[in-house]
Every structure is written in structure tokens, then in C-alpha cells.
């Protein structure tokens, strides 16, 4: 893992970003008034409505940016995920308990090891500002790691993530428990080659939320975002 310098302005950036989004919230909408009407009818009562796609990404640029600027690789990938997902309208709708909700903002759920040897969770608000996202990411992950208290945003659409970096993985299929319908991405350790670094990423989503075409568009946008990230 890379050593990350402490950023003294983290709390200020965190408060500023939170204040911009605190008044936005989710609302229930009529599925028949959306482009998900048919999918909602077909898949909300399905015993297994989740779909998983796996794509191998070229993360060479992320690896170089991480090493060159001393930024966490996982943070950079989470920022790219949020930036790509925010361009897909379907990400802002989510079925839950037989209803469809629309959200005004998005956050990336990050898992961190805590001081008690367990796991803690935090939701990092999505923003186009990489510096602000990095500051919030570091502040929140450090806080939950030390306090063992989750910091979650119930009013944002949450894109779950899980980095299983203890080994290289070809694909990850997450459990479906019928409670969490949120889109979810997971990956293992990246693979460093002579000319490029690659990383298979698995993307799980609820079929009532989006179709395969939307998911494919997101994965393509994620690769473009990775290729063009600038610091």
C-alpha cells in the first residue's frame, strides 16, 4: 500500500461537501412514469433479480497516477466508479420493498479494517472534484477505522464496493440477501505486467434498476474515466 501524507484541510473539505448535499434526498416515484416500468413488473418479485457482469479493465493509468502522486489506488478507482456511474440515469433509481425510489445524489460505500479487527463502513459522497473526494475518503476511512462506527448516508443512492486484495481474482459473485439491492462492484489484486496493469472488476445490479445495455454503458464509461483521470 502507498503511504498517504496527512491532509490538514480534510475536515473543512468534508464539511463543505456535506453542506452542498444535505438538503437533497430520495423520493418514491411511480414506476409506470419511468423507463423501468416493464422491468419493475418483471423483476421486483423475482427470487434472484441480481445480475453480475465481469470485465477486465486496463488500470495502467490509475497505477501510475497512484505511484506518482502518492494517492491510494482504491480511492482513485472509487472516484472513477462514482464519476462514471453519475452519468447513467438508471443509477439514481432503486427498487426496495416493492417500491421504486429516485435519488438526487450518490455515494460510494467503502469498507475499512478497524482497530478491533473487524470491518467498518462509510459512504463517500460522489463529486467531480478529485481532491475533495480524496480528502473525504481519507477522513472517513480513518474515522471509521479508529471509532469502529459506520458513517452512512441513508438519503443517497449507494454504490457498494469491496476490494479483496489478498489475492488475484477472475470474478466475484456477491451474495443476494433480498435486503440490499444497491449496485455493487468488487475486485481482487491488480495484475502488473510488463506493458500494462489489469484488474477484473465484477459489477452486480438489480435487473429492475437497469438492463444489461445500461450496465455495459457504465462499464465502458468507467474504462474511459480511468484512461483520462488527471491530477
Can you annotate each of these PLM segments?
Residues 6, 13-16:
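Short, positively charged and aromatic/hydrophobic N-terminal segments
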Residues 26-72:
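N-terminal beta-alpha "docking/capping" segments at the starts of catalytic domains
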Residues 51-54, 62-69, 119-131, 210:
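Acyl-group handling in specialized metabolite and lipid biosynthesis
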Residues 62-87, 199-218:
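Acyl activation and transfer enzymes in specialized metabolism, enriched
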Residues 91-123, 155:
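Small-residue-rich loop/turn and linker elements
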Residues 114-169:
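Helical lid/core segments from catalytic subdomains that handle acyl or acyl-like groups
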Residues 154-168, 183-220:
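Histidine-centered acyl-transfer/condensation active-site motif
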Amino acid at each position: 500500500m502507498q503511504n498517504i501524507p496527512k491532509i490538514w484541510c480534510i475536515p473543512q473539505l468534508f464539511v463543505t461537501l456535506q453542506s452542498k448535499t444535505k438538503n437533497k434526498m430520495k423520493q418514491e416515484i411511480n414506476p409506470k412514469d419511468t423507463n423501468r416500468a416493464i422491468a419493475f413488473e418483471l423483476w421486483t418479485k423475482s427470487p434472484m433479480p441480481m445480475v453480475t457482469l465481469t470485465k477486465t479493465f486496463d488500470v495502467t493509468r490509475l497505477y501510475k497516477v497512484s505511484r506518482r502522486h502518492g494517492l491510494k489506488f482504491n480511492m482513485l478507482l472509487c472516484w472513477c466508479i462514482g464519476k462514471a456511474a453519475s452519468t447513467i440515469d438508471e443509477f439514481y433509481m432503486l427498487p426496495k420493498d416493492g417500491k421504486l425510489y429516485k435519488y438526487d445524489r450518490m455515494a460510494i460505500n467503502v469498507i475499512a479494517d478497524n482497530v478491533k479487527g473487524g470491518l467498518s463502513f462509510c459512504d463517500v459522497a460522489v463529486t467531480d472534484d478529485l481532491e475533495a473526494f480524496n480528502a473525504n475518503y481519507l477522513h472517513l476511512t480513518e474515522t471509521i477505522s479508529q471509532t469502529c462506527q459506520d458513517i452512512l448516508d441513508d438519503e443517497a443512492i449507494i454504490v457498494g464496493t469491496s476490494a479483496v486484495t489478498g489475492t488475484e481474482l477472475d470474478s466475484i459473485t456477491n451474495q443476494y440477501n433480498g435486503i440490499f439491492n444497491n449496485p455493487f462492484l468488487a475486485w481482487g489484486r491488480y495484475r502488473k505486467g510488463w506493458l500494462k496493469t489489469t484488474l477484473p472488476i465484477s459489477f452486480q445490479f438489480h435487473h429492475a434498476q437497469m438492463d444489461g445495455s445500461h450496465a455495459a454503458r457504465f462499464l465502458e464509461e468507467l474504462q474511459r474515466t480511468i484512461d483520462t483521470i488527471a491530477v
